Amino acid sequence: MKKILIATKNQDKITEILDLLSDINMKLISFQDIDFNENIEETGRSFQENAVIKALTAGRKTKITTLAEDSGLEIDALGGRPGIYSARYKDGSDMDRCMKILCEMKNISKEKRTARFITIVAIYEPLTEKVVTFEGMSEGYITDKPLGKNGFGYDSIFYNFALKKTNGQAKLAEKNKVSHRSEAILKAKQFLIGL
């Protein structure tokens, strides 16, 4: 059975990806399964560059077909911040980062709070040395307070237009029907099936 390495140490992302790929006829493994402890530096200037860096680095070292992704939140009123720095926007917890965003946006009206989550999935195939990428996007806006306890990252402050509630108020199955990550992963899934 073909192996696919999911190149992330973020357990929440692994959970979402495993759920989305649960019916694929391949063995999905993570860094923990192969004792991969290297820290991959995200030195790219875009989600695509970072996803490709992660896929190439992990795939070349392990010689396993590798799926990596980079995601982030872009807020129009903040000039696209936090963007590629979403996970590193502020030291501390996910809630600390949410509160920083809410503080920065406290005087911004609802109609100017538009935002989107973007995911780029990169798949590296060691036999061909090629990388292919897939994009997913969710449109919405930033709420004025956290709503919901599900998900991770900025989910509690991102009102998802497709869900008609925050990602934090949605169950994983609901979120995985319309999220930026699910859109990109489902495109990648079709590619993987063809390998």
List the predicted regions and their residue ranges.
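Anionic-ligand binding patches
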Residues: 2-5, 11-195
